[in-house]
């Protein structure tokens, strides 16, 4: 991985890590204020989710696929500032129109995603309406952030979400101080003031996250002035990409509705068919918690690497330097796979300690209901992460068709497996099947994805090195999982925990200690296997971290960093301060 991409990935990852920490504090305060069950908690989760779902549709179809590649191309033109002002103005106009339209449609959207009591529906509609402006600010954040990323200014872009979380924490803190815990309060308790302190302050935080980016935007020499018009900014050639990309997220959201409805109905169906308590069956809450933990390494590492590499690959392709783009893509895929395979092993071997360490307020019984879908999701983590980088590469080629084909196949597998499971398996297994379906849907069609990608690189995407790297990481992952699973019960006994099939005892300290010990075990096995197999990516990743994290090592005197082939690549850190 090149020096600039490695540095920028670490900047993005550090910002994401800080965002996750403050976000976890926000989650704790949210649970304190509204609880984790009951109509208020469910209504708030739905209200905050719906605008993000709508924005995902927009970001996939317009911003990530169209505007970001055009930003890279525009920066090379003589009248870059004029064209960028047009792009920003176009984005603002589209976002304002969409936000207003979705605000009007809020009651219909709530009925589509929420299946609950009249109280839940009414409060969810109010929360959703307060959160709707987030669509505008998320979009603005993406556009301005990618301009900064294209200019190698990552710090504010990476860290602004921390400010959003802090503002939301202040809102929840004020709510708790003024009104206490609202888990069992009636519907008439929820006045506009109380809704504003919860949903409103979160929207205010997202607004800060976007608007603060105008400060570094000015520092790089671009002073935004509204300028209407689309002539000369190259959007015509990107129209098909937008259409294909919108199709991707459209199919994805259809499957998301299927997942949500199946997961929500699982406890009720188990109670109805098997006469079980709904509290003993994994449902939507179990799945959402598993998916949130699964997304931690994905958002911290995969998204950071993809965000950092995208402008670089786009620039190489715009310059018709296919060899440079191939080298960057190969390096990113090989290094990313090595890292994500380790996290996959961790999710398979120690899901329970991870869950109890991150969610100390839940019981072992609840954690066990989350652990199985988390392990199932972990199986597909490496390839789902790789797809993100490959998707961005297709977009750099102005190609939205091939990512759509892959995702259409993926979503068909997911939807088909999930729906079939509701007919042939008991409701107690539905959530695990959802996790497995997601993993399998990325694994089975992955060879087709690489075949389609190969056509963009003159028939060669550095296949031999990538396949070799993936195979070595897979062998190391299997070895780490086998040894880790053999040691797991012994580690539980060592720390004093007792885990049965459906329940057990493990406090927070025991969970943390178990997680540390099992992580050490799988890390030793994983790294030893990679070393024995002479995986060149191991040297690359460790060298990149050692050169940039204080106490782990020193940077090469030449100012470069070791690339996967052992050569030194000149650092670009001295090219300017990062904003």
Label each region the model flagged.
Residues 1-579:
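Membrane-embedded alpha-helical bundles of multi-pass transporters/translocases
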């Amino acid at each position: 991985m090149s020096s600039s991409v490695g540095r920028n990935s670490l900047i993005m990852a550090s910002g994401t890590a800080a965002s996750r920490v403050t976000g976890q504090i926000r989650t704790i305060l949210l649970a304190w204020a509204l609880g984790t069950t009951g109509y208020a908690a469910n209504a708030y989760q739905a209200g905050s989710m719906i605008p993000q779902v709508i924005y995902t549709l927009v970001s996939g179809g317009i911003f990530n696929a169209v505007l970001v590649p055009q930003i890279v191309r525009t920066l090379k033109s003589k009248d870059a500032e004029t064209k960028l002002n047009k792009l920003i103005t176009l984005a603002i106009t589209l976002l304002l129109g969409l936000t207003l339209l979705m605000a009007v449609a809020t009651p219909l959207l709530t009925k589509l995603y929420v299946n609950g009591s009249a109280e839940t529906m009414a409060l969810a509609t109010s929360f959703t309406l307060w959160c709707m402006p987030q669509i505008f600010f998320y979009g603005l954040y993406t556009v301005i952030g990618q301009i900064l990323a294209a200019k190698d200014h990552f710090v504010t872009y990476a860290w602004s979400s921390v400010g959003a979380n802090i503002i939301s924490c202040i809102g929840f803190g004020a709510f708790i101080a003024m009104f206490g815990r609202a888990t069992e309060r009636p519907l008439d308790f929820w006045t506009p003031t109380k809704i504003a302190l919860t949903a409103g302050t979160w929207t205010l935080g997202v607004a800060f996250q976007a608007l603060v980016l105008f400060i570094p935007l000015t520092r790089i020499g671009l002073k935004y002035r509204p300028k209407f018009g689309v002539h000369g900014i190259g959007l015509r050639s990107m129209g098909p990409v937008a259409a294909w990309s919108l199709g991707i997220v459209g199919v994805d959201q259809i499957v998301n509705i299927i997942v949500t409805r199946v997961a929500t109905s699982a406890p009720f169906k188990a109670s109805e068919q098997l006469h079980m308590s709904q509290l003993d069956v994994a449902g939507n809450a179990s799945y959402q918690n598993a998916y949130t933990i699964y997304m931690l390494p994905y958002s911290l590492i995969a998204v950071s690497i993809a965000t950092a590499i995208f402008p670089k690959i786009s620039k190489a392709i715009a310059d018709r330097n296919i060899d440079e783009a191939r080298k960057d893509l190969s390096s990113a895929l090989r290094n990313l796979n090595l890292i994500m395979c380790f996290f996959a092993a961790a999710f398979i071997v120690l899901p329970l300690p991870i869950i109890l360490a991150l969610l100390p307020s839940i019981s072992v019984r609840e954690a066990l209901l989350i652990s199985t879908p988390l392990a199932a999701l972990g199986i597909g983590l490496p390839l789902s992460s790789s797809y993100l980088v490959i998707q961005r590469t297709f977009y750099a080629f102005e190609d939205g068709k091939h990512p759509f084909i892959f995702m259409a196949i993926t979503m068909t597998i997911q939807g088909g497996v999930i729906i079939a499971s509701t007919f042939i398996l008991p409701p107690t297994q539905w959530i695990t099947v959802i996790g497995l379906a997601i993993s399998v849907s990325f694994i089975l069609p992955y060879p087709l994805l690489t075949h389609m990608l190969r056509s963009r690189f003159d028939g060669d995407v550095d296949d031999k090195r990538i396949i070799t790297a993936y195979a070595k990481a897979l062998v190391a992952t299997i070895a780490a999982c086998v040894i880790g699973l053999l040691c797991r019960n012994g580690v539980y006994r060592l720390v004093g925990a007792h885990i049965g099939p459906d329940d057990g005892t493990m406090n927070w300290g025991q969970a943390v200690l178990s997680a540390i010990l099992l992580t050490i075990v799988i890390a030793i096995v994983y790294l030893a296997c990679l070393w024995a197999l002479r995986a060149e990516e191991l040297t690359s990743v460790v060298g990149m971290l050692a050169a940039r994290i204080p106490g782990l090592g020193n940077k090469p005197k030449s100012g470069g960093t070791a690339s996967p082939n052992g050569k030194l690549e000149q650092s670009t850190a001295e090219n300017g301060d990062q904003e």
